Amino acid sequence: MREITKEMIKEYRLMKLGYDFMGYEIKNKQDLSFHHLIVPRRNCEALGLGEGYLKWNGSILNQNTSHDYLHLIEAKDLDMFMAITSEMIDQNIKGCLDIENLRRIRDILECFEREHSSDRGKKGKLLIKDDYVRRRKF
């Protein structure tokens, strides 16, 4: 785990809260990962930001649920992805996880789920996994 990830977990008291920047349950600290918010990792080096692991550019998400789900949303509905990202940027600026931001994120996720509940991948499996819905705390 990167040092910035550890620092943000501590600063935002994520283990004590028990949920990440999108309101997903945290079971194990090792499951958490850094998500690039403003400058995608693929663009960071060209902009002189190294790999972009900077506090102002990140949120902490549960890799197997919220992080993977967010990238699925990015691929399917860029507007919803940007709306969720905006809420997480706001939390980053505030320096804390805010219940109103988390509620707006939940509303966006529920809208995505209504629109894409029957979408399937190339292998015929539903794109929205049960854990994406069940492991939300908000």
Predicted regions and their residues:
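Bulky hydrophobic/aromatic packing residues
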Residues: 20, 80, 134-138
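Short recognition patches in nucleic-acid-associated and regulatory proteins
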Residues: 28-48
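Polybasic, low-complexity binding patches
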Residues: 41-59, 66-131
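Cys/His/Pro-rich metal-binding microdomains
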Residues: 20-22, 59-63
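Short cysteine-rich loop/turn motifs with clustered Cys
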Residues: 2-33
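Short Cys/His-rich local motifs and their 1-3 flanking residues in nucleic-acid-associated proteins
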Residues: 25, 64-67
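Positively charged, low-complexity intrinsically disordered regions
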Residues: 14, 36, 115-117, 121, ...
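Arg/Lys-rich, low-complexity, intrinsically disordered N-terminal tails that contact nucleic acids
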Residues: 1-9, 120-138
